[in-house]
């Protein structure tokens, strides 16, 4: 259906490529679909997943200055160790992966990391510097780090801390969104509601690069003319693909499919683990975002 929509619009409607500043009905339809599926107030279309996280980062900073009234140039964004948000300068500034950071410094200031899934470390940092922290920006389930699923009570406790200290909960759903974990968005598995999310990858239905940021009105509205832009974000064909990707997610019940098939896959993983306990240390995951960890460390580095 997504491919058919692309062919139709290319052949019949001959869609041009126009910058996001030029409004058109296709982008309006995409923004409406994206706000509906996310339950957020507003959406900003982008192209790549890294772009969506980069804009999330910028929006959190701007909200910190304009809404929370953090002193100029003192805003802090907190991330988690083992994170992966892309390979832009802001993303590698937050990364603790030496392969991503090597010879790309100096890095952006105003970033601090806490161990992932460590509520005590986060609480300590919030208590020490909460008045200057704008956001905790993090993956609901860490992907690149090895499909790290946090404890069941982690995210509810994080949300309580964020509300207590007036800190945004910003989630990177680029890898985890669009049904992959058994829910439309992974945060829904943990019964929390982030203030802003970044989406990409499957948002383009496997056809075109499509991404977006969805958030609360008070965050998105900090953008002003000239403060943000995109040549290809939300251009007509990408908007068509975005609409049909969301339609496919809902109509084909892809989240439910991932949940059912994920259980089958995890059962197979556990069978293999039971057969080779000396080789497989652990199985873990949610839906079809799954992994098994080997005992032998020489098999753990996917880059080698």
Tell me the role of every PLM-derived stretch.
Residues 1-304:
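Conserved N-terminal phosphate-binding loop of PLP-dependent enzymes in the Aspartate aminotransferase
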């Amino acid at each position: 259906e997504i491919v058919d929509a692309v062919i139709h619009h290319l052949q019949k409607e001959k869609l041009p490529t126009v910058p996001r500043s030029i409004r058109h009905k296709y982008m309006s339809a995409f923004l409406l679909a994206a706000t509906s599926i996310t339950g957020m107030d507003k959406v900003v279309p982008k192209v790549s997943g890294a772009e969506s996280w980069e804009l999330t980062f910028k929006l959190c900073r701007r909200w910190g200055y304009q809404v929370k009234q953090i002193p100029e140039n003192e805003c802090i964004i907190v991330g988690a160790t083992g994170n992966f948000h892309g390979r832009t300068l802001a993303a590698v500034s937050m990364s603790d992966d030496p392969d991503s950071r090597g010879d790309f410094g100096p890095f952006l200031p105003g970033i601090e990391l806490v161990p992932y899934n460590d509520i005590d470390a986060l609480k300590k940092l919030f208590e020490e510097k909460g008045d200057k922290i704008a956001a905790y920006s993090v993956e609901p389930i860490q992907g690149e780090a090895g499909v790290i699923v946090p404890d069941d009570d982690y995210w509810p406790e994080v949300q309580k801390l964020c509300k207590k200290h007036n800190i945004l909960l910003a989630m990177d759903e680029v890898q985890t969104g669009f049904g992959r974990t058994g829910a439309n968005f992974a945060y829904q598995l943990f019964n929390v509601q982030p203030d802003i999310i970044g989406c990409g990858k499957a948002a383009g239905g496997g056809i075109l690069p499509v991404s977006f940021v969805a958030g609360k009105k008070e965050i998105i509205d900090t953008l002003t003319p000239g403060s943000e832009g995109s040549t290809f974000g939300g251009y007509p064909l990408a908007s068509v693909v975005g609409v049909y990707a969301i339609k496919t997610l809902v109509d084909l019940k892809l989240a439910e499919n991932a949940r059912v098939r994920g259980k089958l896959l995890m059962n197979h993983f556990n069978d293999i683990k039971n057969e080779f306990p000396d080789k497989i240390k652990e199985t873990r995951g949610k839906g079809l975002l799954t992994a098994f960890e080997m005992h032998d460390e020489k098999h753990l580095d996917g880059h080698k």
